[in-house]
Amino acid sequence: MLTKRIIPCLDVKDGVVVKGVKFRNHRIIGDIIELAQKYSDAGADELVFYDIGASPDNKLLSIKWIQEIAKKINIPFCVAGGIKSVENARAILNEGADKISVNSAALARPDLIDELVYEFGTQCVVVGVDSKFIDGEFKVCQYTGSADKTVQTLLDPVSWAKEVESRGAGEIVLNCMNHDGVKGGYDLEHLREVQLNVSIPVIASGGAGEIQHFIDVFKYTNIDGALAASVFHDDIIAIPELKQELFKNNIPTRIVK
């Protein structure tokens, strides 16, 4: 049985790690390199870096820190932000990232997914899906890194997830925007609905506030990993303790000695 992944998420803006609530009111958390090293040493299974200003501002993320991250940590990491072409992705992967993630650019031009998969392989290509419950239904949102530039699309998350899979993406990160940063737990029902409609790995994002939330998302959905930010940045949850509790609850996890 594959182990479930614990994935700290580092939102990057203007060269530092930040965190907001429901994608708004971001506060500075700290240095990218130091936090990456901290989470790697603590036993995280993977890291995700989002340059949250890149897509809304129509620019590629700064890549100067990626090579340094690759030198410092020994776990896989994924990088996202403003990737609009094979050339953009190649620059990031060449610096040492293991995966790249696309979101808004894939919504604008879905063929981008096919092109990235053809060039780099399924295992390198992640698609982020920002899902928001609006007027009684879930819709996929775009350009969510900036409050005044966020766009609600006409797509429902299940249909978009199916298309993403059909185009060859290797993984989906489903971020439930209504739950983001509020620490009330993952949206189990929505995660389950999307996960049951695709066969590729789905990563849960948005809502972690305590260890029980991680236990619940792994027990009551078949997602492959859980992404979180605030609980790790604010030292609410220590990754070694989280891993031990998952193990006690018969959830397969990698324990760091």
Protein language model annotation of sequence segments:
Residues 5-9, 46, 74-78, 99-101, ...:
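Structural preference for beta-strand elements that scaffold enzyme active sites
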Residues 1-22, 132-133, 255-257:
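N-terminal amphipathic alpha-helix/helix-capping segment at the start of soluble metabolic enzymes
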Residues 11, 39, 47, 92, ...:
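Conserved, mostly hydrophobic/aromatic
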Residues 17-60:
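N-terminal beta-alpha supersecondary unit
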Residues 2-6, 54-71, 84-90, 104-126, ...:
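Active-site-adjacent beta->alpha loops and helix N-cap segments on the catalytic face
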Residues 28-40, 85-91, 153-163, 211-214:
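Short, acidic/polar
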